[in-house]
């Protein structure tokens, strides 16, 4: 069979399933959406091309001489470094491809993750909403673990929902090598699988939760020890930001609405807008998985208020995979196809 015939057979095989046809329809649109978000990111990030920016940072990362948390997020710089070696692309080009490709995968994965509960047009709209709010998170800094974090976060949620426990453990480990934010997701695993307060089932679930997340936590502890105590890297900006975050949030609430466009500390509210509220209205009508997963959200926000700079609203974007479908079920209940 020649290559053309083989390609035709693959195309036909994909087209035989309704989801295959849907995939072929949406992937091109999402590829362009990912390109649009990349173009905006590059426009607002001169550091990408400055001599002392991305290339210099990458050089220091590959020699274990950069700052944490970036140094510990090894996949964010190992993948572009591998692309650079394999293809001959420049370092900025390799990082461009990484961001474009993983954001595309996140869009596709989010679309089909939602198809359990929504018809295709609603899933498509949810992805477009995510693409529309992503530029709000873009600032002139380099946080290139973001794209793979976005993809891995929704993929792990999907694996937890389908109770694919060992696949979840493997992906969680790999994702933790890119960004430690995914370490919150074992809470979703526990909440979703919780059934009773009886001692024996509770101990069994606790043990399974700890067992499946142990590799990711062990890796994260080791890489942090290695980078801090062996490589002597410093934590950029420190690890305590609660007082600054709360002060600036309170201050920003009092500024003129005409200044909201640069009120970075309010972006945590703006990024999902009323969907923050809609997600919790008629809560019992939401699917069990989303209700249980949403219990993680307060923990997620508190952790970022304490250890992160909350004006960097990209930190909230992974919550879109929970907040957006919950809000949409309240807004458009007629579009849901299954609640479970």
What are these regions (language model features)?
Residues 74-77, 92, 124-149, 177, ...:
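Aromatic- and kink-enriched transmembrane "portal" helix at the membrane-lumen/periplasm boundary
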Residues 110-132:
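Transmembrane-helix signature of polytopic, membrane-embedded enzymes
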Residues 97-117:
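Transmembrane-helix motifs of polytopic, lipid-linked glycan transferases
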Residues 154-157, 166-180, 185-192, 207, ...:
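Membrane-interface alpha helices of multi-pass inner-membrane proteins
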């Amino acid at each position: 069979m020649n290559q053309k015939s083989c390609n035709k057979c693959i195309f036909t095989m994909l087209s035989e399933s309704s989801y295959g046809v849907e995939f072929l329809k949406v992937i091109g649109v999402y590829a362009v959406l990912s390109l649009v978000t990349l173009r905006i990111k590059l426009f607002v990030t001169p550091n990408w091309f400055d001599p002392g920016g991305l290339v210099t940072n990458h050089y220091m990362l590959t020699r274990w001489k950069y700052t944490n948390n970036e140094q510990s997020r090894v996949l964010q710089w190992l993948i572009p470094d591998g692309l650079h070696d394999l293809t001959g692309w420049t370092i900025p080009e390799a990082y461009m491809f990484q961001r474009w490709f993983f954001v595309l995968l996140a869009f596709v994965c989010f679309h089909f993750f939602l198809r359990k509960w929504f018809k295709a047009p609603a899933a498509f709209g949810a992805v477009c909403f995510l693409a529309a709010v992503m530029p709000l998170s873009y600032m002139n800094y380099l946080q290139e673990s973001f794209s793979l974090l976005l993809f891995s976060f929704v993929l792990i949620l999907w694996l937890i929902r389908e109770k694919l426990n060992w696949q979840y453990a493997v992906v969680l480990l790999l994702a933790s090598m890119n960004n430690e934010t995914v370490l919150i997701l074992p809470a979703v695993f526990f909440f979703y699988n919780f059934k009773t307060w009886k001692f024996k089932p509770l101990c069994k679930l606790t043990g399974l939760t700890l067992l499946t997340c142990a590799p990711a936590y062990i890796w994260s502890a080791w890489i942090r020890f290695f980078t801090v105590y062996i490589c002597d890297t410093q934590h950029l900006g420190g690890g305590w930001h609660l007082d600054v975050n709360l002060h600036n949030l309170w201050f920003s609430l009092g500024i003129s609405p005409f200044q909201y466009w640069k009120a970075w500390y309010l972006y945590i509210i703006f990024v999902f807008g009323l969907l923050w509220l809609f997600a919790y209205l008629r809560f019992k009508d939401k699917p069990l998985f989303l209700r249980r997963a949403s219990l993680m959200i307060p923990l997620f926000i508190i952790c970022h208020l304490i250890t992160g700079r909350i004006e960097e609203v990209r930190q909230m974007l992974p919550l879109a995979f929970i907040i957006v479908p919950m809000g949409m079920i309240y807004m458009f209940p007629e579009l849901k196809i299954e609640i479970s």
